[in-house]
Amino acid sequence: MSDNKHRVTRRQFLNYTLTGVGGFMAAGMLMPMLRFAFDPILRETAGTDMVAVADVKEITTEPKRFDFKVKVKDAWYESEEPRSAWVYKDEKGDIIALSPVCKHLGCTVDWNTDKNNPNHFFCPCHYGLYTKDGTNVPGTPPTAPLDRYEFEVKDGKLYLGKAKPRGEA
């Protein structure tokens, strides 16, 4: 055996120790940051975007406004956003769910509030008019019909999804 053993000097020991401790500290700081950055990508989303709004029994041929809340996720921030819909049954008994957002400048339309134009959706901001099925009346400010909500009926309840544009009139 040789007397030439490999000895660690004090300087090397401190260097190894500080490097190890620094590495653990850096990992401790980086792990939460990485989890924060990648969590939305790795998290599973909800199975459906449909929200229960009303009992089908409540829906008549007269448009009725239903207010509801939708869970919205903006990156890491989750909130409940209030929404509303004008819902009625047409002559065939089919359910129609219209967005109340005017296609002119985004004001809220109301049903049957303009005395000069009964049985129309009316936007009081700029006097926009829509027929009962949500079609914009020519000669008024709106440039497109009201959006329609996706919907499904399940167990006697009406579920609404996203509002879909219907295009130019």
Curated annotation (Swiss-Prot):
Q: Does the keyword Ribosomal protein apply?
A: no
Q: Mind telling me which PROSITE patterns this protein's record contains? A: RIESKE, TAT
Q: What is this protein called?
A: Menaquinol:cytochrome c reductase iron-sulfur subunit
The cofactor required is:
[2Fe-2S] cluster
Assigned keywords, A-Z: 2Fe-2S, Disulfide bond, Electron transport, Iron, Iron-sulfur, Metal-binding, Oxidoreductase, Transport
Q: Specify the species.
A: Geobacillus thermodenitrificans
Known function: Component of the menaquinol:cytochrome c reductase complex. The Rieske protein is a high potential 2Fe-2S protein.
Share what the entry says about its subunit structure, partners included: The main subunits of the menaquinol:cytochrome c complex are a Rieske-type iron-sulfur protein (QcrA), a cytochrome b (QcrB) and a cytochrome c (QcrC).
Which Gene3D superfamilies does this one have? Rieske [2Fe-2S] iron-sulphur domain
GO terms of molecular function = 2 iron, 2 sulfur cluster binding; metal ion binding; monooxygenase activity; oxidoreductase activity, acting on paired donors, with incorporation or reduction of molecular oxygen
**Where does the Rieske domain start and stop, copy by copy?**
62-160
Q: Which cysteines are joined by disulfide bonds?
A: 107-125
The cofactor binding remark recorded in the entry reads: Binds 1 [2Fe-2S] cluster per subunit.
Superkingdom in the source lineage: Bacteria
Which family is this protein grouped under? Belongs to the Rieske iron-sulfur protein family.
Listed binding positions for [2Fe-2S] cluster are 102, 104, 123, 126
